[in-house]
Structure formats: C-alpha cells, structure tokens
Amino acid sequence: MAAETKALIFAANILTLPTFMRLPLFILILAFTFTSCSKFAKVQKSTDYDYKLRMAEKYYVAKKYNNAQQLYEELFPIYKGQPQFEDLFYKYAYCSYYLKDWLQAENLFKQFTEVFPTSQKAEEMEYMRAYTYYRQSPKAELDQTNTQKTIGLMQTFINTHPGSTRLKEANDIIDKSREKLEQKEVKSAVLYYNMGHYLAAGIAYSSLMNNFPDSKNSEEYKLQVIKSYYLYARNSIDEKKAERYEKVLSECNDFTDRFPDNPLAKDVERYRNLSQSNIKEIQNEQAKKTD
C-alpha cells in the first residue's frame, strides 16, 4: 500500500479521536504528504536519466505505480533502443495493469509483443493481454464483447504456446468465460418464457444446446424447448395447433434419443402424452365436421 494511501486511511481514523488531538496529527500528515510530493517533483525535474530510472524502479518495487508510471513514460523515448528499454517497457505496461487501466494495459502488452517478439517475456505479455479482456468482462446481463475477446485470445495463446505453464489458467478462464456467455443466453431464454413469447423461448433454448453442447444443463434446456413449444402450440389458432403439437412430439423423440434413461424423461413423457391427446382431439373434431 502506498504511503499516501496509508496517510489517508490514518487521516480518516483521526476523525474518531478527541478534538484536541486532531490538529497536531493533521499537521503531521500534511507535512508527510507535502514532503513525499516534493521529493517526487524533484525526481521529475532531474535531468539525470539513470537516476530517474533507478527511482522509477524504486517506486515500482514499493508499489507506487502512479509515480513509477509517470517516470517510465518520461523515460520511454530516452531509452528506446537501449538495453534497458525492454525491462522499462515491461514494467511500464504492468503499471497500467496494477492501476486497473485495462485498456491502456492491453494496448501496452500487445505493443510489447510487437516490439520484442523474441523476448522471454513475450509469452507472458500475450497471456496478460488476454487476461486484461477477462478483467473487463462485465456481468452476464451486459454486452459480452470483452468476454468473447477473452475466449479468442486465450485460445490463440493455448494454440501458440502448447507447452506453457499457463495452459491450465488459460483453459480455466475460457471455461469461466463460456459459462458467462451461457448464463447470458439462459437469462434471455427465461425472459422470453416468462413474458409468454414461447416460440422465441423455444428457439432460444435450442440455440443454447447448439452453442453449448457440453453444458451440464443440456437436458434441462431440452425440456424447456419441449415446454416452450407445447405452450406455443396450446396458445395457437386452431388451424395451426396440430402441426405445432407435432413439433412437440418431434422434440420429445429427440430428447429420448439424446438422453435415454434420464430422470427428466417422466416430464417429457407427460408432454408427449398431452400433445398426442390434443392431436387426437383435433382430428376427432375435424372428422365430425366432415361427417
């Protein structure tokens, strides 16, 4: 934790002290903060670049990333092409990462691999670039562009570095990202169903099965397809009901083929029987009309 941050926390704690004790301590904190800022200002003004680089390293090690970042940025054009530049670039990129400036960090990690493609740190930078997208991935309800980019870049990393020690981490992140995409689609399907848009719900649940064939919830999605199409058929105009109940039967048969001896088979059988009964009733009504 940076000294300035500790000082601010300490200042907040002072407010709980008796009034007569607060002023001396506030003065002490202000003096400490002013001294720290004054010292950094002197470093910035220095024209001794080696000294500034040493101080940047010192701030970096002390986790004062904001100070380190400012110095590295000033030194960037000075050391470009020099032996120190690779390490400077590496730490400059990480400053943005530790400051949670994900967009800047992603850009710098990418640039590092372009400037130093044969560096021993290039593999790490490729991984970190993908990881910054993962850190930007929002809740399932929101746009999942960054989640999709995470999956794409992590998969590229795995393909490019099959012997990397980071493979397990990369695969775990892909799995978590895919779970989030799946969750987003589930929420959409549930919303359609709850709103009574049963055709849209049936299509959405079918898409879930196609998009996530290895999902542990595939059987439940298939049952929801059946339920959605059944309710769609039941609420249809008379002329369309029979063919839509046939669609339910087709989905029931598909469930049996895909998931034999599944515990949900009883529910599927109920919708099969209901659909068959309704089709038979429709056929009987049609037969009466022709008599």
PLM regions with names:
Residues 11, 25, 34-291:
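Acidic, polar-rich low-complexity tracts and alpha-helical solenoid repeat scaffolds
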